[in-house]
């Protein structure tokens, strides 16, 4: 099961809602549960959305701590995200966060976990 758009928790630069954290904690312990790290900029409800990584960090830290390197999948949510931030800004926010977790995290979150979840087939 893929939880899309981080479970639609509102983002305001503060730690996320306690009930959301508790629910995500319960579901993250189940087998075969992935969470798509997408929708961050849309969930701020601000236009344009914040461009500083620290604004999103409290929510991203919760996701990292619950789903970790093996069950997070990056998604841009483009073109919907374009109403709140440029594609480049959305991707850079995610990249800057996950690069602090190491090169293996980048590979897992940006493509390997997606390949595993969606059962992508190599076509070359």
PLM region descriptions:
Residues 41-42, 78-81:
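Short Gly/Pro-enriched loop/turn and capping motifs at secondary-structure junctions
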Residues 61-62, 66-73, 82-124:
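Mid-to-C-terminal alpha-helical segments outside catalytic/metal-binding sites
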Residues 1-73, 122:
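Catalytic pocket-lining loop regions of alpha/beta-barrel enzymes
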């Amino acid at each position: 099961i893929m939880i899309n758009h981080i479970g639609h928790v509102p983002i305001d630069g503060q730690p996320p809602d306690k009930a959301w954290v508790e629910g995500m904690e319960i579901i993250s312990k189940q087998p075969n549960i992935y969470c798509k790290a997408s929708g961050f900029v849309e969930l701020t409800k601000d236009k344009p959305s914040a461009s500083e990584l620290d604004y999103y960090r409290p929510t991203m830290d919760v996701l990292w701590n619950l789903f970790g390197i093996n069950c997070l999948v990056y998604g841009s949510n483009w073109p919907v995200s374009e109403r709140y931030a440029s594609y480049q800004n959305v991707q850079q926010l995610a990249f800057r966060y996950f690069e602090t977790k190491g090169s293996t995290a980048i590979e897992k979150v940006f493509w390997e976990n997606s390949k595993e979840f969606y059962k992508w087939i190599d076509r070359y």
